[in-house]
Regions:
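Short, flexible helix-loop junctions that flank or precede catalytic/ligand sites
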Residues: 1-140
Length: 140
């Protein structure tokens, strides 16, 4: 998600980037990055998601050009806001045996962190992320 913000800002000339950061921090509604991964034990693919919700702290980081700190804010905003990093999602998918270790590592931009998270068994908080829509309540 942080890379997405940098890509948006970098489209503009250097002299406009401060103004663009400010505007982006005010209007951003969220960022969802996704990739399709080969399933481990079944044909087909499964989606891995990185989800960022622009909290006041994240909006401030964008304004102050501290984009590199957004990743930490996403990690800590997981349980309350449903945010997740790609590595958190990959860890969960691996621990659920949805994807192989090779697939998880190939999709990760920080393989050392991913390996550490998998070894700790630390994935996504239950109910947060993974892009699953809630199951609709049955009518009575």
């Amino acid at each position: 998600a942080a890379q997405t913000i940098n890509r948006i800002i970098d489209v503009f000339p250097a002299h406009q980037q401060g103004q663009i950061r400010t505007q982006l921090s005010l209007v951003l509604e969220g960022i969802v990055c996704q990739t399709l991964l080969r399933k481990a034990n079944a044909p087909g693919r499964i989606v891995a998601l990185e989800i960022m919700v622009p909290t006041p702290a994240i909006r401030n980081l964008i304004r102050e050009d501290k984009i590199h700190q957004i990743y930490s804010a996403m990690q800590t905003g997981q349980e309350k806001l449903g945010m997740q990093t790609m590595n958190q999602c990959l860890t969960t998918l691996y621990l659920q045996k949805q994807i192989t270790m090779e697939t998880a590592l190939s999709a990760s931009s920080n393989k050392d962190e991913l390996t550490e998270m998998i070894n700790r068994g630390a994935g996504v908080v239950p109910g947060a992320g993974l892009g699953r829509a809630p199951v609709p309540a049955q009518r009575r």
